């Protein structure tokens, strides 16, 4: 019996696009890109291929190309609600919030039952200072999809910011019911209990979490924060990485709702020092995050290096296109290994994850050249007497002004400290310290051990 011949056939264009979408969902982006390219060579006006090729470009950080492709797809198929919502996502990531809001509203006009568009609209309404409209948008998303975890989480965050803490806690409880091991919701619920003075309930959440995941850095750190027991001298690397990797995508949108001022306060302290762009300095942005501070100090820099522990944050910093290099490293190790490398070190809202500052300050002193400047922000431990530092229930450290002055002076630096409000949190201003310290020509050598 003769073996049967296998038969092959070429995929239709629709089948090819569906195959590319499957590759895209499986994170095989290069392979998907190759399929979209071939489809669009054969049919340049194929709406689905244009749209999903645009989404792929967005996934790969090419937002300009992404928007061009998505706009072409919508010109060909203007009544696609999903596509309008996706356009909003790309615009939002590009910082074009008003245009993104319009795109989400257009998606809802086409399909009033589009729960994700309602939720995404709520995020931007909150970010642009419209909490009443944001709440309505989140509740619309929940009404359409009673298991919409993101909408419940976002509504809880909004309500907490409006000091409606008990309502916020109810939202987080719902999220945990839907997804029992969702880290962010567990943390938010525990913080809500802390706000309500229910520290025992907060501790129970973290203790149960640790019983299930004994090595989880977030649960361990936050248990210490809400109980005051076994407080570490600084947040563990794992805590910082896990916190900011999960937070990176929404980081700037959230800060936009908090009147966040730390980078601007750092820049003002540089202007106060008389720095001018003509000086062309070698600058370290220590804990660069998504690059908010880097964008402000770039005019002073001949060379700007950003260092952070979070790959997610570094990816967003790369989009700012202001850094000469971005490095994933622990700050103390990096600065300590780069003697006399920088004229200026800035650190906005990063040293709040250090309690004991002696080691990191010693590393910064080594990394600074003579007459170099160190500028950073801290949260101010107001009303705690002459405390060195305190781990607060939200997981960040606050520091005493006297402690900071003594530490910098003993390190041979000349400090100037200004008190300022860093941002709003739960409806109240967060008191801060903006610190500038100059390294003299012959600074006192300091070791991390003191």
Residue ranges and their predicted role:
Residues 358-370:
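A short glycine-rich, Lys/Arg-flanked "PGG" loop and its adjoining helix->strand segment in the class I
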Residues 284, 288-334:
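Class I SAM-dependent methyltransferase SAM/SAH-binding core
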Residues 17-25, 48-59, 82-93, 116-127, ...:
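Conserved alpha-helical positions within TPR/SEL1-like repeat arrays
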Residues 336-345:
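A short acidic, Gly/Pro-enriched loop at the edge of an enzyme's catalytic core
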Residues 376-396:
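Short, glycine-/aromatic-enriched active-site segment of Class I SAM-dependent methyltransferases
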């Amino acid at each position: 019996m003769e073996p049967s011949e296998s038969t092959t056939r070429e995929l239709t264009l629709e089948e090819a696009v569906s195959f590319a979408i499957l590759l895209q969902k499986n994170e095989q982006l290069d392979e998907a890109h190759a399929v979209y390219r071939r489809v669009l060579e054969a049919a340049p006006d194929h709406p689905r291929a244009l749209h999903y090729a645009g989404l792929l470009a967005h996934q790969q950080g090419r937002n300009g190309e992404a928007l061009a492709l998505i706009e072409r797809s919508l010109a060909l198929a203007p009544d696609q609600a999903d596509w309008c919502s996706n356009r909003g996502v790309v615009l939002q990531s590009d910082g074009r919030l008003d245009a993104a809001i319009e795109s989400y509203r257009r998606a809802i006009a086409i399909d009033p039952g589009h729960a994700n568009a309602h939720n995404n609209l709520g995020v931007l309404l909150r970010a642009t200072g419209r909490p009443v409209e944001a709440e309505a948008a989140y509740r619309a998303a929940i009404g359409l999809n009673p298991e919409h975890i993101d909408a419940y989480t976002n509504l809880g965050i909004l309500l907490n910011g409006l000091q409606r803490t008990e309502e916020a806690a109810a939202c987080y409880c719902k999220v945990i019911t839907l997804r029992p091991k969702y880290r962010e919701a567990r943390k938010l619920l525990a913080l809500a209990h802390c706000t309500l003075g229910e520290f025992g309930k907060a501790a129970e959440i973290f203790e149960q979490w640790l019983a299930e995941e004994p090595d989880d850095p977030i649960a361990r750190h936050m248990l210490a924060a809400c109980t005051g027991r076994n407080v570490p001298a600084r947040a563990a690397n794992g805590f910082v990485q896990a916190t900011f990797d999960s937070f990176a995508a929404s980081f700037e949108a959230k800060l936009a709702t908090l009147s966040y001022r730390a980078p601007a306060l750092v820049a003002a302290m540089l202007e106060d020092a008389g720095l001018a762009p003509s000086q062309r300095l070698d600058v370290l942005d220590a804990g660069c995050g998504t690059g908010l501070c880097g964008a402000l100090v770039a005019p002073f820099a001949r060379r700007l290096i950003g260092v952070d522990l979070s790959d997610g944050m570094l990816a967003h910093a790369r989009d700012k296109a202001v850094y000469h290099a971005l490095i994933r490293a622990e700050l103390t190790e990096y600065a300590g290994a780069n003697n006399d490398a920088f004229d200026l070190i800035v650190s906005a809202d990063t040293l709040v994850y250090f309690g004991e500052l002696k080691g990191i300050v010693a590393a910064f002193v080594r990394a600074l050249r003579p007459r170099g400047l160190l500028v950073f922000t801290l949260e101010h431990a107001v009303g705690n007497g002459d405390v060195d530092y305190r781990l607060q229930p939200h997981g960040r450290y606050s520091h005493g002004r006297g402690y900071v002055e003594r530490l910098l002076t003993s390190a041979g630096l000349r400090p100037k400290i200004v008190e300022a409000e860093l941002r709003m949190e739960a409806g109240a201003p967060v008191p801060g310290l903006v610190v500038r310290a100059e390294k003299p020509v012959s600074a006192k050598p300091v070791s991390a051990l003191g």
